[in-house]
Swiss-Prot record:
Belongs to the glycosyltransferase 64 family. InterPro entries: GT64 (IPR053318), GT64_dom (IPR015338), Nucleotide-diphossugar_trans (IPR029044). Disulfide bonds join 228-287. Mn(2+) binds at residue 141. The active site is at 230. Residues 1-27 form the signal peptide. This is Glycosyltransferase family protein 64 C3. GO terms for molecular function: glycosyltransferase activity; metal ion binding. Keywords: Disulfide bond, Glycoprotein, Manganese, Metal-binding, Signal, Transferase. It comes from Arabidopsis thaliana. Pathway: Protein modification; protein glycosylation. GO terms for biological process: protein glycosylation.
Length: 329
């Protein structure tokens, strides 16, 4: 083999490796450059890109497990770990990068992107490396089974303009206080959380690059509150579509960050803002009121029920002295 051939082989190996496993600082130079945006119809429709937000060093072992799970799914094209803690030592990120590449069993490409700031808005930046129509926005403390992931994707493909997720909340209007609030209703919802939020890639550009002065002010509110980027994305999607999100049922979703966990290490469980529930709900209510003030309207719309991946008998029959579903023995 000649010198030119050897050089070509080394260059080719480097490029292929960089495509599969990549650690970079920040992202695209100008994520809002419209010339970098691909036409929706030319993007892959058979797979998704997973964007995982990471911040806490205590959650790194859990993050590695979650990335490995996503990478083993055949519907995942690539995984971008968006590290939002600027104070994390480079040595620790280097080790994380090595572990992600070494212990992730699937064929999905994996990138570790060190964000230039801790802004929660950065998780919605358009990224030129994303080559799929659908993106999954998720947190570093939620683990979902593969069948439920695939089912959520199938629901999204039938409703590509809607936000699809497994965790939902709602806005409401407090008649006594005469103000908008953040709440939970037992029979309706209007907000999908970024614990698991599937959506079309176009919404990244819509959130980060459009909307003019109004949208810029609302993104500033997210930075000031250090919260509510998911609520703002729901405002963006609902305002564009005039429809609410879709909740999908899941067989198994482990939420390690839920404050109600009893046997999870505190440093892992209590990292998230949602662990401080009363304060968290008030702050998010403030966000809803501020977004409403800036927009001059309330675009959020209610959805009812959830989509499930199985259809069983609903009729009841008496068997062995008990009322049970008729298709059960």
């Amino acid at each position: 083999m000649g010198v030119k051939s050897v050089r070509f082989s080394i260059w080719f190996l480097f490029v292929v490796t960089d495509l599969v496993f990549c650690r970079t600082l920040s992202g695209d130079p100008d994520p809002c450059d419209a010339t970098n945006q691909r036409e929706f119809q030319k993007l892959r429709s058979d797979q998704i890109t997973v964007l995982i937000n990471g911040y806490s060093e205590y959650r790194i072992p859990l993050l590695q497990t979650i990335v490995a799970s996503y990478s083993s799914s055949s519907i995942v094209s690539s995984i971008l770990v968006l590290w939002g803690n600027p104070s994390t030592p480079d040595q620790l990120l280097d080790q994380l990068y090595q572990n992600l590449t070494q212990y992730s069993p699937g064929s999905a490409s994996i990138s570790l992107i060190q964000q230039s700031s801790s802004s929660l808005n950065a998780r919605f930046l358009p990224r030129s490396s994303v080559d799929t129509r659908a993106v999954l926005i998720c947190d570093d403390d939620v683990e979902i089974d593969q069948r439920s992931l695939e089912f959520a994707f199938s629901v999204w493909k039938s409703n590509p303009d809607r936000l699809v997720g497994t965790f939902v909340r709602s806005h409401g209007f407090d008649l006594q206080g005469k103000e908008w609030i953040y709440t939970v209703h037992p029979d309706k919802y209007s907000i999908v959380l970024t614990k698991f939020m599937m959506m079309k890639q176009d919404y990244l550009f819509e959130y980060s690059c459009k909307g003019g002065v109004e949208m810029e002010e609302m993104r500033m509110i997210v930075d000031q509150m250090r919260n509510c980027e998911d609520i703002l994305m729901n405002f963006v999607a609902a305002d564009r579509l005039r429809a609410g999100p879709i909740m999908v049922g899941a067989e198994r979703v482990r939420d390690w960050g839920d404050a109600r966990n009893e046997e999870v290490e505190e440093r892992v469980r209590d990292v998230g803002l949602s662990s401080r529930r009363v304060e968290h709900r008030k702050r998010r209510g403030n966000c809803i009121r501020e977004f409403h003030r800036v927009m001059g309207k309330m675009p959020l719309m209610y959805s009812y029920g959830k989509v499930v991946n199985s259809v069983g008998e609903q009729g009841l029959c008496r068997k062995a002295g008990k009322l049970v579903f008729c298709d059960r023995d």
